[in-house]
């Protein structure tokens, strides 16, 4: 054994948070990065090629974490950044007083670094279901280094 100790904290193995995709191939309900925010595309319109230049794509998208509306216009032949968006389901174990949740992962360990969602209706559903003693499964969306609870699944009483 050597005296050197290596500590690797990264969990994404150096993988890129986004990948390039040609603007003309991004469709409604797809994902795109606008102003460094991961967004879901709600509307795409394409303008014809003009006298000087390319056809342009006009994207209207909603930030997947803040629900803010963002817009961007990109030449259809150019590449856009598309975020790697992952959805994972976890069983809710506990809600702490400071607003953090304790979640059970598939391999049996716990995940304790997520806060309750900002969405009031979802927040109330989670709290009331948890207070009623139901087994709750929350859906966590992650993209570009951010994570947030975005859905709730009720799997019945305990």
Curated annotation (Swiss-Prot):
Keywords assigned by UniProt, alphabetized: Hypusine, Initiation factor, Phosphoprotein, Protein biosynthesis
Post-translational modifications: Lys-51 undergoes hypusination, a unique post-translational modification that consists in the addition of a butylamino group from spermidine to lysine side chain, leading to the formation of the unusual amino acid hypusine. eIF-5As are the only known proteins to undergo this modification, which is essential for their function.
GO MF annotations, alphabetized: ribosome binding; RNA binding; translation elongation factor activity; translation initiation factor activity
Induction: Up-regulated at post-transcriptional level by iron deficiency.
GO CC annotations on file: extracellular region
Matching InterPro entries: IF5A-like, IF5A-like_N, NA-bd_OB-fold, Rib_uL2_dom2, Trans_elong_IF5A_hypusine_site, Transl_elong_IF5A_C, Translation_prot_SH3-like_sf
Superkingdom classification of source: Eukaryota
Stretches with biased composition (Basic and acidic residues): 1-10
Tissues with expression: Expressed in leaf vasculature and inflorescence stems. Present in xylem tissue but not in phloem, and in developing vessel members, but not in mature vessels members. Detected in anthers.
Disruption phenotype: No visible phenotype, but presence of extra root protoxylem cell files.
Modification Phosphoserine, positions: 2
Residues with Hypusine modification: 51
Pfam families linked: eIF-5a, IF5A-like_N
Cleavable signal peptide: none
Region (Disordered): 1-21
GO biological process terms, semicolon-separated: positive regulation of translational elongation; positive regulation of translational termination; xylem development
Protein purpose: Translation factor that promotes translation elongation and termination, particularly upon ribosome stalling at specific amino acid sequence contexts. Binds between the exit (E) and peptidyl (P) site of the ribosome and promotes rescue of stalled ribosome: specifically required for efficient translation of polyproline-containing peptides as well as other motifs that stall the ribosome. Acts as a ribosome quality control (RQC) cofactor by joining the RQC complex to facilitate peptidyl transfer during CAT tailing step. Involved in xylogenesis.
Similarity comment: family membership: Belongs to the eIF-5A family.
Protein name: Eukaryotic translation initiation factor 5A-1
Protein source organism: Arabidopsis thaliana
